[in-house]
Amino acid sequence: MPIILSYSGFLLAAPIPASAPFTGLNKIRLI
């Protein structure tokens, strides 16, 4: 059970840092 919780927590936390550079590039393009 702890393995499943940590794995799901990793999946939830992973997209945030991964998408941060892309959103930054999009903001620079808009400006």
Swiss-Prot record:
TM regions (residue ranges): 7-25
Keyword check for Repressor: no
A GO CC term attached to the entry: chloroplast thylakoid membrane
Topology in the lipid bilayer: Single-pass membrane protein
UniProt-listed GO biological process terms: photosynthesis
A GO term for molecular function: electron transporter, transferring electrons within cytochrome b6/f complex of photosystem II activity
Intrachain S-S bonds: none
Family according to the record: Belongs to the PetL family.
Summary of the function given for this chain in its UniProt record: Component of the cytochrome b6-f complex, which mediates electron transfer between photosystem II (PSII) and photosystem I (PSI), cyclic electron flow around PSI, and state transitions. PetL is important for photoautotrophic growth as well as for electron transfer efficiency and stability of the cytochrome b6-f complex.
Record text on subunit structure and interactions: The 4 large subunits of the cytochrome b6-f complex are cytochrome b6, subunit IV (17 kDa polypeptide, PetD), cytochrome f and the Rieske protein, while the 4 small subunits are PetG, PetL, PetM and PetN. The complex functions as a dimer.
Protein name: Cytochrome b6-f complex subunit 6
Source organism per UniProt: Huperzia lucidula (Shining clubmoss)
Species lineage: Eukaryota, Viridiplantae, Streptophyta, Embryophyta, Tracheophyta
Gene behind the chain: petL
